[in-house]
Amino acid sequence: MKIVVSSEGRYLSIRITDGTLIIGRSSSCNVTLQDPILSRQHCALTRDVDRVICTDLGSSNGTFLDGESI
């Protein structure tokens, strides 16, 4: 399964396999983006059979999916 992440007008295609991916600014994240709006550990993407669950990890600016806050 593949998703697209938008950050500062750029788009990043991410393939999600089993397990959880952490997105954020920290080098400890699976996906690191140097966007000042992102928290060090911003959100988690977890694949669940035929869908992806996005969980905000207490980020300062929130996490949005198709313009809607989650």
Residue ranges and their predicted role:
Residues 4-6, 10-70:
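Forkhead-associated
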